Amino acid sequence: MLIIETLPLLRQQIRRLRMEGKRVALVPTMGNLHDGHMKLVDEAKARADVVVVSIFVNPMQFDRPEDLARYPRTLQEDCEKLNKRKVDLVFAPSVKEIYPNGTETHTYVDVPGLSTMLEGASRPGHFRGVSTIVSKLFNLVQPDIACFGEKDFQQLALIRKMVADMGFDIEIVGVPIMRAKDGLALSSRNGYLTAEQRKIAPGLYKVLSSIADKLQAGERDLDEIIAIAGQELNEKGFRADDIQIRDADTLLEVSETSKRAVILVAAWLGDARLIDNKIVELA
């Protein structure tokens, strides 16, 4: 497994792979890898000749400096996991390598609408940071496919739109959420939970599933469903942050023509902001 930290070396390797006619898959990450990331790697390996995993804690997508400062940096452990998975190349640049003149004056990519709604409304600048770094990685790695987790549902929708709008010749693969046996979606943020909070955490998925059951049973008073769900979360020990029921294909309000709904839930548990989602077919 090759570990590359600089842009010139990455470009050199990508040129070589292209000359050899290899099909390249990219898995963008911020490190602190868990089994959910490994599922992305496995999907990439099944679809391509060469797998490139990027590990970069992107300062542009953090709206709170304290969150950036405390995000775990576990490069050595991450590389050991990826080596066992027989990943071909790890791109682990420094912030200086990606943003040589800092982030304030760096050219950015913005996806109107999707970047400022829902999660974007509560995290200003977050999705602009995501679309900027992902587009830069696409330009550097020139992958044939790129794999993203469906846990970050809005992020996946945003990247799909960016790829379509910008004309990137890249297949975007959404990989289903990987869950612990008790239903909790795997996430790097789970590491912020205490042992006691970890016992409470599966309650998020239970509330999510309860909303899904109501929708499948034909209930359509969304305001009431959301209000009850928020109360249930708070009673379980969470601080409900945002609960939305949207059209799964547009992320707009559910309408009579909507065929699928996506339930998007975000809640605080201690210092961890947990997110999850579930898609429901509407009769």
Swiss-Prot record:
Q: What GO cellular component term, any one, is given?
A: cytosol
Pathway of this protein? Answer: Cofactor biosynthesis; (R)-pantothenate biosynthesis; (R)-pantothenate from (R)-pantoate and beta-alanine: step 1/1
Enzyme Commission code(s) on record: 6.3.2.1
Main location class? cytoplasm
- The EC class name is ligase
Q: Where found, per UniProt?
A: Cytoplasm
* TM annotation in the entry: none
In this chain, beta-alanine is annotated as bound at Q61
Matching entries from SUPFAM superfamilies are given as: Nucleotidylyl transferase (SSF52374)
CDD domains linked to this entry: PanC
List the active-site residues: H37 (proton donor)
Q: What's in the keyword line of the UniProt record?
A: ATP-binding, Cytoplasm, Ligase, Nucleotide-binding, Pantothenate biosynthesis
Molecular function as annotated in GO: ATP binding; pantoate-beta-alanine ligase activity
InterPro entries attached to this UniProt entry:
Cyt_trans-like (IPR004821), Pantoate_ligase (IPR003721), Pantoate_ligase_C (IPR042176), Rossmann-like_a/b/a_fold (IPR014729)
Subunit structure comment from the entry: Homodimer.
Quote the record's miscellaneous comment.
The reaction proceeds by a bi uni uni bi ping pong mechanism.
Classification via PANTHER family: CYTIDYLATE KINASE/PANTOATE-BETA-ALANINE LIGASE, PANTOATE--BETA-ALANINE LIGASE
Functionally, this protein is described as follows:
Catalyzes the condensation of pantoate with beta-alanine in an ATP-dependent reaction via a pantoyl-adenylate intermediate.
The family line of this record is: Belongs to the pantothenate synthetase family.
This protein is called Pantothenate synthetase
